[in-house]
Swiss-Prot record:
It is an enzyme of class 2 (transferase). ATP binds at I220, G221, K222, G223, A224, F225, G226, E227, V228, K243. GO terms for molecular function: ATP binding; identical protein binding; protein serine kinase activity; protein serine/threonine kinase activity. Residues 214-518 form the Protein kinase domain. Residues 1-16, 24-33, 99-126 have a biased composition (Polar residues). InterPro entries: AGC-kinase_C (IPR000961), Kinase-like_dom_sf (IPR011009), Prot_kinase_dom (IPR000719), Protein_kinase_ATP_BS (IPR017441), Rho-assoc_Ser/Thr_Kinase (IPR050839), Ser/Thr_kinase_AS (IPR008271). Residues 519-598 form the AGC-kinase C-terminal domain. The keyword Transferase applies. This is Serine/threonine-protein kinase cot-1. It comes from Neurospora crassa (strain ATCC 24698 / 74-OR23-1A / CBS 708.71 / DSM 1257 / FGSC 987).
């Protein structure tokens, strides 16, 4: 076979003839055969190739033509097995199939209509019917597990995007610092410090925290759904306050939205007026919040110890509480549970807010129907015996401070119970008429009243009586005659404990700051001045200012293990978390960037 006329690339050397050799190459069609449709001449393409071969000398007559040689012989032989019957019936040749000819490519061929797909036979079904969906065969938790996986994936990408934005913001801040200095050593220090922190944070994200990493020193508080413990991290000895919440109680008492709201506000807040949250984690039974430990105790402990405050001391603490509430409002949240128990004092004696709506109050008892019946005098719930004095029946004066403190201690025990204390809650929350940010300013007024008078304005022996007094505040608000208050102090209290339309602070915290009672107060520098009370601490784990003697020191985890052992259930570490208890808490885990760098 002569290979001198094989096609080759046009590289400017087409006039150079390749040296012939004795190697044999396979022959293939130069162009893929085109289908021939009715009315089309099959020889048109071949005539074009012949004409092109004459002018360009790229083809020869009958060279690489499959109509000659073996291709022509095989076209007239049956070299396969017997054909099988098609379920679709008989059909014509495919349009892509080259027509079999006897070398006469100019012969006209006739074909059927190949533009419409062949239809299956009416007597035979093409596909078997699809089986009916039966998710129950996979177990009752199949749908919950599907939702859990979907939520996990969604939260994973949301957290990744959020961390990327925060990292870009930190990079912008670092570049700004680099641009403010020309000192090479200073720039190198800023760069290396930022890189080290980012690396530590990435490693911190990959670690899994658990309660076994911390040693419990003492239980410093208990609420309706959990407890707060003073703990020390075993790895580095740092001291924290660990709040643990029981998942089953959160689920039963409809507190799922509240627990997530508390986590979100503490995670988003970086204010000095709000307790700092470092990390959150969970296991099969508990939710854990690792927060900063504030050794000064709470404002209720100070009221029990000092009974009443002077107007100057009251002015200081109320001014700081105003800034703390305003910081929460700027984050878009309403605290709704401002009370002395939730106002903590740090090492310097300054105020910080904590416990965002979880420990007390907002569950079945806050149903609108309950208060409708209560206002109609249909309440038949028996009174609970909390060893309280009959404050509603006695005349509160300065001379019976012992009875007032007995009431305060009983009220603290009530705060530990599932009933909670309604003394500081605004009436619009009870009546269901809708409430806004100004409901926290009502609570501020009741706290100010207690600091100056010695008891809340609507306190009573029974919580139902307290509800009645709050709702009918116009008739029950009373200032004792034997206690002299300044004109500005009483005016501020009355401007806060009033209907929501006229309440001071409805337009913002600046309305309260500009009141005459705070004349001369520099709100911007409050945390830089010395507080009226500074805790005297002997160590980093000193709990002198917490009522630990009144709190049962048996933690909830120990009680849960004992209950499960009595039932013969698996240990908490070996339990598999059910979708009902895991699905609502997906995305609860949080790790602050500066957790390991304080």
């Amino acid at each position: 076979m002569d290979n001198t006329n094989r096609p080759h690339l046009n590289l400017g050397t087409n006039d150079t003839r390749m040296a012939p050799n004795d190697r044999t190459y396979p022959t293939t069609p130069s162009t893929f055969p085109q289908p021939v449709f009715p009315g089309q001449q099959a020889g048109g393409s071949q005539q074009y190739n012949q004409a092109y071969a004459q002018s360009g000398n790229y083809y020869q007559q009958n060279h690489n033509d499959p109509n000659t040689g073996l291709a022509h012989q095989f076209a007239h032989q049956n070299i396969g097995s017997a054909g099988r019957a098609s379920p679709y019936g008989s059909r014509g040749p495919s349009p892509a199939q080259r027509p079999r000819t006897s070398g006469n490519s100019g012969q006209q061929q006739t074909y059927g209509n190949y533009l419409s797909a062949p239809m299956p036979s009416n007597t035979q079904t093409e596909f078997a019917p699809a089986p009916e969906r039966n998710p129950d065969k996979y177990g009752p938790n199949a749908n919950n597990n599907q939702k859990k996986c979907s939520q996990l994936a969604s939260d994973f990408f949301k957290d990744s995007v959020k961390r990327a934005r925060e990292r870009n913001q930190r990079q912008s801040e670092m570049e700004q610092k680099l641009g403010e200095t020309n000192d090479a050593r200073r720039r190198e220090s800023i760069w290396s410090t930022a890189g080290r922190k980012e690396g530590q944070y990435l490693r911190f994200l990959r670690t899994k925290d658990k309660p076994e990493n911390y040693q419990t020193i003492k239980i410093i508080g208990k609420g309706a759904f959990g407890e707060v413990k003073l703990v020390q991290k075993k790895a580095d000895g740092k001291v924290y306050a660990m709040k643990s919440l029981i998942k089953t109680e959160m689920f039963k008492k409809d507190q799922l939205a509240h627990v997530r709201a508390e986590r979100d506000i503490l995670a988003e807040s970086d204010s000095p007026w709000v307790v700092k949250l470092y990390t959150t984690f969970q296991d099969a039974n508990f939710l854990y919040m690792l927060m900063e430990f504030l050794p000064g105790g709470d404002l209720m402990t100070m009221l029990i110890k000092y009974e009443i405050f002077s107007e100057d001391i009251t002015r200081f603490y109320i001014a700081e509480i105003v800034l703390a509430i305003d910081a929460v409002h700027k984050l878009g949240f309403i605290h709704r549970d401002i009370k002395p128990d939730n106002i903590l004092l740090d090492r310097g004696g300054h105020v910080k807010l904590t416990d965002f709506g979880l420990s007390t109050g907002f569950h079945k008892l806050h149903d609108n129907n309950y208060y409708t019946q209560l206002l109609q005098g249909k309440s038949n719930k028996p009174r609970d015996n909390r060893n309280s004095v009959a404050i509603d029946q006695i005349n509160l004066t300065v001379s019976n401070r012992a009875q007032i403190n007995d009431w305060r201690r009983s009220r603290r025990l009530m705060a530990y119970s599932t009933v909670g204390t309604p003394d500081y809650i605004a009436p619009e929350i009870f009546t269901g008429h809708g409430y806004s940010f100004d409901c926290d300013w009502w609570s501020l007024g009741t706290i100010m009243f207690e600091c100056l008078v010695g008891w809340p304005p609507f306190c009573a022996e029974d919580s139902h009586d307290t509800y009645r007094k709050i709702v009918n505040w116009r008739h029950s608000l009373y200032f004792p005659d034997d206690i002299t208050l300044g004109v500005d102090a009483e005016n501020l209290i009355r401007s806060l404990i009033c209907n929501t339309e006229n309440r001071l602070g409805r337009g913002g915290a600046h309305e309260i700051k500009s009141h005459a009672f705070f004349r001369g107060v520099e709100f911007d520098s409050l945390r830089r001045i010395r507080a009226p009370f500074e805790p005297r601490l002997t160590s980093a784990i000193d709990t002198t200012y917490f009522p630990t003697d009144e709190i049962d020191q048996t933690d909830n985890a120990t009680l849960l293990k004992a209950q499960q052992a009595a039932r013969g259930a698996a240990a908490p570490a070996q339990q598999e978390e059910s979708p009902e208890l895991s699905l609502p808490f997906i995305g609860y885990t949080f790790k602050r960037f500066d957790n390991n760098f304080r």
